[in-house]
Amino acid sequence: MGSEMCIRDRNFRDAIAAKYEHFSGIKVDPESEIVVTCGSTEAMMATMLSITNPKDKVVIFSPFYENYGADTILSGAEPIYVPLVPPDFTFSIEQLENAFKQGAKALILCNPSNPCGKVFTFEELTAIADVVKKYDAYVVTDEVYEHIVYAPNKHIYMQALDGMRERTIVCNSLSKTYSITGWRLGYVIANPEIIDRVKKVHDFLTVGAAAPLMEAATVGLKFDDKYYDELAAHYAHMKEVFVGGLEKLGLKYTDPQGAYYVLVDVSEFGVKDDVKFCEWLAQYVGVAAVPGSSFFREDVHNLIRFHFAKQDDTLNEAINRLAGLRKAVAEAGDVEWR
């Protein structure tokens, strides 16, 4: 009885549908077009298991959130990587189409992107949609950062594009928008045929999300536009503090258009091994970063990722410590990362 309550919590799904329609303009049926999952991690895994067969191929833009490759492989499919080329993280339509010529069944699109902060333009999304329609495939979207977008950029919903209503499978989460990462509340929005499969997979993966947390989160889903405006302004402030600090230090970075990550180019320091460099950075400079190579399929070792969703005091202290980076590098001598 409790499991059935979790699966069929109509209040939560009604609230998801209403919010999604408000921002995307798309009306969805809470009963037949939404499945509630234990976070977007399960949403993506359940989706991949629902739409792929063993040896199917799935297109993934690189750099990418590491789960995408793992989810594809765990579902028995094979990833095909298409590069987003720094510093603007543009992609080649020819390379994208070549990936689909290999028989790709779907493309995973993280928009805004983790780790590079790219927000795909209308023209880019339309180009992707045209290729997907041409090869009769799906787009699986990860839109967890939909409300963390920096002006003048705008988040555009793939499902709202012409001909993409039935071809788009939306994976989303409440974690980032409402700062409730530990609650593990996510959802899938798709056409009824896909949702019917996702429901079955979801039942065997986790059975259901926590009913009390769904009831509590329903309140958040009903917040008015003022909340989302304030959220965007709050993240824009954090970006200004940290990325503005990087600018003052003269460090080379790619300006994030959305999400709360920034990739910094450390090639000026002669970095050959970004993993070793990040270990050294934490130990000798006192600032933590993630090696960029963990997100790229390509041989990229000159980028590191910083996360700036922190209090001002923490961000300012990080910038103060990074101010000593060049001096620390000069005094480092013979280090493993060079």
Which positions does each model-derived feature cover?
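Short, small-residue-biased leader/transition segments that mark boundaries at the very start
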Residues: 1-7
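Long amphipathic alpha-helix in the N-terminal Rossmann-like dinucleotide-binding domain
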Residues: 8-14
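PLP-dependent class I/II
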Residues: 1, 21-338
